[in-house]
Design a protein with these regions (language model features):
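Extracytoplasmic metal-acquisition and chelation regions
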Residues: 1-239
Length: 239
C-alpha cells in the first residue's frame, strides 16, 4: 500500500508513467490530476482489465499484429504490457508529446526507440512458423503475438495463471503430458515467480530435452531494461 509520502510525490509529479490495467492502481487512483498520467494499458481497478471492450485472445492479437504491428493490444487482461513493442512506442510517443507541449524547444523525438523496436520485431519474426510453445505463466504473450508460433499451454492452466490463480491438478497434469508427448517445442519460464507447479513443469521440460527460455517480469539486478529486452528477444529468435 502507498504511504502518504508516496501519494504526495505522485501528486507533485508533472508526469506519471504507469503500467495501468489495475497492476499499479494504488498509485494512479490516488492522483488528483489524471491528465498527468501516461499508461500502457487502460486505467482500471485490479482484476477488471479483462472487461475492456477491446480485450482479445492471443490468436486475435497475432492477427492484429500482422495487419497493424503498431497497435497496442489487451490480450485477455494480461498485465505484462511492457513486453509489447507497440506499447513501448506508444508510451514513448506520449512522453515526447507531453514534454514538447510543456517545453516547446525541447525537440523530444522517439526515433531511436522506434528504430530499436523495429529491430526487436524483426528478431521475433525469425521464429519458425510451426513452433509450438507453452508458458508457465503468460509473460511473453505480447512478444509472441509477433510470431506465427502456436501457444499450446492447456487452456485451463492458462486461464488460471493469467488471473493469478492456482492451476487445477488436472490442468497441470495436462501440461506435463503435453511435454512428455512431444507437443511442446519451447517452454517459456518466469524464474522470478517460481512455484512448485512451475518447477515441476520446468523439470518435465528438462527431462524431455525441451528448449527453455527464461523471461522475468523485471530485468535482473544490474541489467538495464533495453539490455534485458534485447537478450530476451535474441534468445527467442534462436528457436
Amino acid at each position: 500500500e502507498p504511504t502518504a509520502a508516496d501519494i504526495a510525490k505522485a501528486n507533485d509529479a508533472d508526469m506519471l508513467v504507469v503500467n495501468g490495467g489495475g497492476y499499479d492502481a494504488w498509485i494512479y487512483q490516488a492522483v488528483s490530476d489524471q491528465d498527468n498520467i501516461i499508461s500502457a494499458l487502460p486505467l482500471t481497478d485490479h482484476g477488471k482489465l479483462d472487461e475492456d471492450p477491446d480485450v482479445m485472445t492471443i490468436d486475435a492479437a497475432k492477427a492484429t499484429a500482422k495487419d497493424d504491428p503498431d497497435k497496442v493490444t489487451n490480450i485477455e487482461g494480461n498485465e505484462h504490457i511492457w513486453y509489447d513493442p507497440a506499447a513501448l512506442e506508444e508510451v514513448a510517443g506520449s512522453i515526447a508529446d507531453q514534454i514538447n507541449e510543456e517545453y516547446s524547444d525541447a525537440g523530444a523525438t522517439t526515433e531511436k526507440i522506434d528504430s530499436h523496436v523495429d529491430q526487436l520485431r524483426d528478431k521475433l519474426k525469425e521464429l519458425p512458423d510451426d513452433l509450438n510453445y507453452a508458458q508457465t505463466e503468460p509473460i511473453a504473450d505480447y512478444l509472441m503475438k509477433y510470431t506465427d508460433g502456436k501457444d499450446v499451454t492447456p487452456e485451463g492452466y492458462r486461464k488460471a495463471t493469467i488471473s493469478e490463480g492456482e492451476p487445477a491438478t488436472a490442468d497441470v497434469a495436462a501440461f506435463i503430458k503435453a511435454i512428455d508427448d512431444g507437443e511442446v517445442d519451447l517452454l517459456i519460464f518466469n524464474p522470478q515467480t517460481e512455484t512448485d507447479t512451475a518447477s515441476r513443469i520446468k523439470s518435465a521440460a528438462e527431462d524431455n530435452d525441451v528448449d527453455i527460455v527464461e523471461i522475468g517480469e523485471t530485468p535482473p539486478d544490474g541489467k538495464k531494461f533495453w539490455e534485458y529486452y534485447d537478450e530476451v528477444t535474441s534468445k527467442l529468435g534462436k528457436h
